[in-house]
A protein has these predicted regions:
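Alpha-helical metal-binding/catalytic segments enriched in His/Glu/Asp
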Residues: 53-54
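Extended beta-strand/beta-hairpin segments
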Residues: 1-48, 59-143
């Protein structure tokens, strides 16, 4: 059964509908590739998928461990090739984790392993460099 239904709307824009929920995503070609850049580009969604997958799988592992994963933040940077063919060459994910006594060194290592082995990370072509970095805030320091 299909997961997504996508229509090309013209002018380098698509609309994708998640069939189970009805949620819609618009994509637009980026300004550096003759588009308007008014929405996520398809390659932006690839980079976004990596970050979202990392957060989701960390949440799943924490839930299995009986831990409520606190709200965290991440920035995602997508780097495109300078030469042809146009492609993603690097995705940088910088994750800031809030202070929590739950995050022992052992648990931090578990979360970092989870991030590096989420389904999207394992599905991306090995030529795409994945730079996944954590900034673990410490309880009582800078909080």
């Amino acid at each position: 059964m299909p997961t997504v239904f996508t229509t090309y709307q013209g002018d380098l824009r698509t609309e994708a509908t998640h069939l189970q929920s009805g949620t819609r995503i618009i994509t637009d070609a980026p300004t550096d590739n003759t588009g308007k850049g008014e929405a996520f580009s398809p390659t932006d969604l690839v980079a976004t998928a990596l970050g979202s997958c990392i957060a989701t799988t960390m949440g799943i592992v924490a839930r299995r461990d009986g831990i409520e994963l606190p709200e965290s933040e991440m920035t995602i940077t997508k780097v495109m090739s300078k030469d042809a063919p146009r492609r993603i060459v690097r995705i940088e994910v910088d994750i800031t984790m809030p202070p929590s006594e739950v995050f022992t060194e052992e648990y931090r290592a578990k979360m970092e392993h989870t991030a590096h082995t989420c389904p999207v990370a394992l599905s991306l072509h090995p030529d795409i460099e994945q730079a996944i970095r954590f900034d673990w805030k410490t309880v009582g320091v800078g909080s």
